[in-house]
Amino acid sequence: MTGMPQTPLLDRVNFPSDLKEIDDRDLPELARELRDEMIDAVSKTGGHLGAGLGVVELTIAIHKVFNTPEDRLIFDVGHQCYPHKILTGRRDRIRTLRQEDGLSGFTRRAESEYDDFGAGHSSTSISAGLGMAVAAGLDGSDRKVIAVIGDGSMSAGMAFEALNNAGALDARLIVILNDNDMSIAPPTGAMSAYLARLASGRTYMGFRDFGKKLTAYLGKTIDRAITRAVTHARGYVTGGTLFEELGFYHIGPIDGHSFDHLLPVLRNVRDNQKGPVLIHVVTQKGKGYAPAEAAADKYHGVNKFDVITGAQAKAKPNAPSYTSVFAEALIQEATLDEKIIGVTAAMPNGTGLDKMAELFPSRTFDVGIAEQHAVTFAAGLAADGYKPFCALYSTFLQRGYDQLVHDVAIQSLPVRFPIDRAGFVGADGPTHAGSFDTTFLATLPGMVVMAAADEAELKHMVRTAAAYDEGPISFRYPRGEGVGVEMPARGEILQIGKGRIIKEGTKVALLSFGTRLAECLAAAEDLDAAGLSTTVADARFAKPLDLDLIRQLAAHHEVLVTIEEGSVGGFGAHVLHFMASAGLLDHGPKVRTLTLPDQWVEQAKPETMYANAGLDRAGIVSTVFNALGQRQAGVGFAG
């Protein structure tokens, strides 16, 4: 493939209604063109390629059979939504995916009327779809609701909560289980296609409906006999399943890359749906692009790449990543302490725990997309004397917050929480930003909340957490490379609740929590040059605060600025609360708090996002000058 792909069929499709004019026999060629278009686009932007390649035929079939956007279509997580975006009026912008001011990498209601529900986190589609199905019933509408969910997302309890509720309500909901687990072989041959058509057709569904109506007039004994007969007949077609027990009519598995399988089943379900239906579709992640099919991760998330070779463009790192530093430090501690356990929720590669699993497989647990379970599982380990490190992305820790409060914090169980992807994450936008962890953790009694200023500090915090047994403790760190500081052979145990002064001055104090420390030091150079002698301190802890350090900074400086990569209500708010309670604001310094802005910040390069938020060198300098009432060009969000 060289240059722009040739796509004569795809050129005829601007919106799903155009698919109605394309003959079924031409759909395989349309699928090939759609794959070529998506591969070319993602090669220029980077993104989640493998999932979208796996659902090309399924996406075409859904939009051809159903009447979107009147019929509702929800994609779980959203990694697989790129073909959907191309088919729904956004092809001309597909090469802006995940770029500043470009298309989101996920479905977004504000972006298109075809995006019925926003996504980013997993396992939400069935719940949202059920709500829409009930709304359709209340409206007296015949619109259909289709939720597409991957087999990985089915590991979350929320998906089963929704299935259970949908079955109990007998709702008119279509769930398509996109099974791309390569351990499950796709069905092949005419017989499986025939059985799927039979199972979804009028004959069997009518028989089942007749059986339900008949049992309403008969006694329990005959009722049970008829129910067994209907179930037995169903078993001849595809066999009983857990989904049947939950009240769903189950069809499949069927080949998700065969229009001969997909179209008749979807048409039957569209025309005959009585209650909740689950269609089990087997697909191959990365389908149609050899480098993706051959890769272990099926090109789940990729950088820009060469379409011919599949080689990804990766800049040579200047310093080790925070994730790799965490993983190596944890392995070092685990080698010395057999009580240390690693726990993650479907992100072993992303959190670095895959490295620990190679050395300590019996002490490393990937519990699937199940953050609630991960937190309480870790609490159980801690209750019996182990030292669990429950490593989660900041944005996903939100999903386990009740468990963190109820099962960990109230019981003062020493669960360690390494929090990756703290702060802005760039191209994945607001659904994946690590904005809120400091705010929701520091409010909990007995919680220790740390943030690493650089990769050496991260190593200290891993060892500190390993040694701390008094209760729960967390430490946050961002995505990407470290600063490039000299690394200790092993981390030191930090004194809980004590920060450090990096540079001493007399007029301005910059109190940093997290990796904005480097920007604070750069800002201090500019302030010193302007005659404003500046102190720079690293708080290390948002809870417990270093009260002596805050008193010292307040007593000896005219301006005190707190800087953090978190939302309003976090570190700066706790500093202000203490200062107000201690009377340090009565006649003390001018205090300013720099946080992430109180708005959903859209995708861009992280450095751009921080600059726009006023959390870079220029923004810090501007804040100081404004506090002093001196004129200085400002940088930051308006309003």
Swiss-Prot record:
The lineage of its organism: Bacteria, Pseudomonadati, Pseudomonadota, Alphaproteobacteria, Hyphomicrobiales. Belongs to the transketolase family. DXPS subfamily. Its EC number is 2.2.1.7. It catalyses: D-glyceraldehyde 3-phosphate + pyruvate + H(+) = 1-deoxy-D-xylulose 5-phosphate + CO2. Homodimer. Thiamine diphosphate binds at residues 79, 120-122, 152-153, 180, 289, 371. The gene is dxs. Gene3D superfamilies: 3.40.50.920, 3.40.50.970. One of its GO terms (biological process) is terpenoid biosynthetic process. It comes from the Bacteria. Its cofactor is Mg(2+); thiamine diphosphate. Pathway: Metabolic intermediate biosynthesis; 1-deoxy-D-xylulose 5-phosphate biosynthesis; 1-deoxy-D-xylulose 5-phosphate from D-glyceraldehyde 3-phosphate and pyruvate: step 1/1. SUPFAM superfamilies: Thiamin diphosphate-binding fold (THDP-binding), TK C-terminal domain-like. This is 1-deoxy-D-xylulose-5-phosphate synthase. It is an enzyme of class 2 (transferase). Mg(2+) binds at residues 151, 180. One of its GO terms (molecular function) is magnesium ion binding. Binds 1 Mg(2+) ion per subunit. Keywords: Isoprene biosynthesis, Magnesium, Metal-binding, Thiamine biosynthesis, Thiamine pyrophosphate, Transferase. Catalyzes the acyloin condensation reaction between C atoms 2 and 3 of pyruvate and glyceraldehyde 3-phosphate to yield 1-deoxy-D-xylulose-5-phosphate (DXP).
